Structure formats: structure tokens, C-alpha cells
């Protein structure tokens, strides 16, 4: 069986309370990704590459992604509330629940990653599963805004930050792991700005031109994914625009 209500030798991966998935699921997921066709040479939003990035990093450093990011970034940045699998570190009262999952786990997802694929990877994934708060994320985005430096410590080379936060291909609004502006206005985010939005209702944005860091955290999937008014009404983007209009002359 793929799933078990109890943890045993064959079912060690916990996807939520009282549900464990077979250990071989990770190899199955990677095999499916390896076998997937490349398709046409056009832009397509996909998480598949980030599954592979995680596997590559863990192989190179000999540590899981959670341990690696804690040691390389989060602890020295003072991001003490940022982690994968937060139930292992914090009480449930300190963790916000997300969706009542009717298609996979059949319960309120609380303390576990919302993304089903990341859940199958044990909650530590390259594309989803990171829990944090606004203060920690402000530190991370400020480090990016500083060109990879924070608190007199260098985490990334300036050219690395510049490469990942620039528009990668003509005709789309993506950097490497970051969003870019599709269009810009006189009063609003600059072309140099970059950030990221999350499915559960989050947004981080940094603008080197105006020295602005914007953090928006919401819980729009609690308790259901639809209707997605947050995206339809562009709440995150509209609040960001109000900030620019209040600051810029």
C-alpha cells in the first residue's frame, strides 16, 4: 500500500497527522520528472526543476535542504522562525493552519506543508514547504537588496544576486526564482525590482532603485482554495502600489 495510518519500516514519510506514505515515493517522483518530455522551447511555469535543484544541493553538500539553509543562511541572519516542518520546532499554536484538504489528506492542514507534492517529499522540498514570518523575510529580502550582504556578513556575491534577479528571457517577467515586473510606471515598482508570490497568499518584494522591501503574508487558502479573491482583485499588488504612491514624490 502507498499509505499507512501508522508509521512502519515501509512508511516513514509523514504527510500529515496519522498518514504516512511509502518510502519509495521520492524515487518514483524523481523518475517521473526525469522521464517527462521537455516540450516546445517556450516559457512554462513549473516546479519540476526545483525538485531537482534540491536533490543536487543535498548530494553536493551531504545534508538535507532544511539543515543546509539553516547553516548557510537562516541562523546567522537571525531568521529563527524560518524552517521546514515547523511542528518539529514550534508549538502548534504558533503555526497558522491552511486549507481543509478535501482531495488528498481529508483534514485541516495544520503544521504541515500545504503543497501535496512537497508533503510527499517529507515536507522538505525545493519548491514549497518553507514556513516563516514577516520579520524573518524582511531580513532575507534586505540581504538580497544589499547585493548579498547583511550585518557585515557576505552571504552571496553581488553578481550572483544580479544574475538571479534579472529578467532571464525577453518576453516574460521571470528572473531565476524571482518574479519581475511585466510593465512599469513612473510611480511604482522599478524594472530593477524583484520578488515572489506564494500560492497560499504571500508576497515578498524588493526594489533596489527605491530601497523598498515589501512583505505581505496572508492565509487565503484557509479554509478553502476558492474563490481566489486575493489574486482576482490584485490585493497584494494594489497594496504595494499604495506604498509607492505614499513614498515617491
Per-range role (PLM):
Residues 197-249:
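Structured C-terminal helix/loop/strand segments within mature extracytoplasmic catalytic/sensor domains
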Residues 1-192:
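Short, surface-exposed loop or secondary-structure junction motifs
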Amino acid at each position: 500500500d502507498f499509505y499507512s495510518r501508522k508509521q512502519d519500516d515501509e512508511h516513514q514519510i509523514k504527510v500529515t497527522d496519522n498518514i504516512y506514505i511509502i518510502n519509495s515515493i521520492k524515487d518514483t517522483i524523481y523518475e517521473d520528472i526525469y522521464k517527462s518530455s521537455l516540450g516546445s522551447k517556450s516559457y512554462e511555469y513549473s516546479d519540476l526543476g526545483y525538485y531537482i535543484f534540491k536533490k543536487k544541493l543535498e548530494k553536493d553538500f551531504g545534508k538535507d535542504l532544511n539543515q543546509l539553509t539553516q547553516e548557510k543562511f537562516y541562523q546567522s541572519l537571525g531568521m529563527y522562525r524560518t524552517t521546514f516542518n515547523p511542528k518539529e520546532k514550534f508549538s502548534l499554536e504558533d503555526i497558522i493552519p491552511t486549507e481543509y484538504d478535501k482531495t488528498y489528506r481529508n483534514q485541516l492542514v495544520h503544521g504541515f506543508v500545504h503543497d501535496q507534492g512537497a508533503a510527499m517529499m517529507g515536507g522538505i522540498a525545493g519548491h514549497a514547504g518553507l514556513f516563516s514570518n514577516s520579520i524573518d523575510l524582511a531580513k532575507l529580502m534586505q540581504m538580497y537588496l544589499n547585493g548579498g550582504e547583511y550585518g557585515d556578513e557576505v552571504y552571496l556575491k553581488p553578481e550572483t544576486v544580479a544574475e538571479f534577479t534579472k529578467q532571464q528571457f525577453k518576453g516574460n517577467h521571470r528572473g531565476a526564482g524571482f518574479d519581475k515586473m511585466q510593465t512599469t510606471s513612473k510611480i511604482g515598482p522599478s524594472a530593477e525590482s524583484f520578488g515572489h508570490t506564494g500560492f497560499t497568499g504571500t508576497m515578498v518584494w524588493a526594489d533596489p532603485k527605491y530601497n523598498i522591501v515589501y512583505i505581505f503574508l496572508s492565509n487565503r487558502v484557509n479554509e478553502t482554495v476558492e474563490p481566489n479573491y486575493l489574486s482576482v482583485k490584485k490585493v497584494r499588488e494594489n497594496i504595494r502600489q499604495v506604498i509607492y504612491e505614499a513614498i515617491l514624490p
